Amino acid sequence: MLRLASGADLAFAAQAARFGDDAMTVQLIVTDEGATRVITLRRPEKKNAITQDMYRAMSAAIDTAQNNPAIRCLIITGGSGVFTAGNDLEDFLSDGTSNTGTARSANNAIKFLYSLAHNVKPIIAAVDGVAIGIGTTMLFHCDYVLASTTATFSTPFIHLGLVPEGASSLLMPHTMGYQRAFAMLVMGRTFSAEDAQVAGFVNVVVSPGHTEAEAKKVAREICKLPAEAVAISRRLIRLPPEDMTRRIDQESHLFGERMRSKEAVAAFKAFFSRKKA
């Protein structure tokens, strides 16, 4: 079930979806607090692993903010203790694969990434705890990232026989340099909050349990600035959205090919075997 603020857009409300087997379980909460839209992943029992429905709802939350002048800023958070473990792999693979070999559910993740790439509103991430896979790559689409001292960042695509996604092969080297991007994307190195701040993709490190509150302070600061000047300046300093979506498409094609590879099949088999053990 999706919980909406009372003033949320009708178009967004129309896209609200029920999540999970238990209709009372809220897996995504979207609230409009003043001029800020807060998108909260709320699936702690699965470390906020993202399902197809959650991707669709996050895309809707971002897309409906674009032409809403009342929304000046966006925040993505996982609440206290965990940001997200990335894709829910069982859900990701449950819909089968397309003729390119990509999981059909990947289309929902790609739509979410497109929403991030085309987003024109400042977006802040509040990361408390683990950020795995797309939980890390989505941060490179954000304008400001806060992390707790216990936050960790990892992209274990290679260990699953796969390749980078989310335009991370473009954005990571652009943000933190080739060598650091290689260490994270190819070698699968985990970055601490301090590592991430030194690398340049985390702005501020705060105490655990305080990332969301601090993110809201940053949002209020941004919302006080002249909106048009912010939008123009943001557009000037970001990579063009067309570059990002082009790279998302390239990565997705290669990702689909890799899904059919012997390496990926063996890696997924081993992953689920460990999970059942």
Across the structure, where does each feature detected by a protein language model lie?
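Conserved CoA-thioester-binding segment of acyl-CoA-metabolizing enzymes
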Residues: 2-79
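C-terminal long alpha-helix characteristic of the crotonase
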Residues: 44, 146-151, 202-250, 257, ...
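Glycine- (often His-adjacent) and acidic-residue-rich active-site loop
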Residues: 78-118, 131, 243
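A general structural signal for well-ordered alpha-helical segments in protein cores
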Residues: 89, 109, 169, 178-181, ...
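CoA-thioester-processing core
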Residues: 111-118, 126, 132-186, 199, ...
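Acidic, divalent-metal-coordinating active-site segment for phosphoryl/phosphodiester hydrolysis
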Residues: 188-195
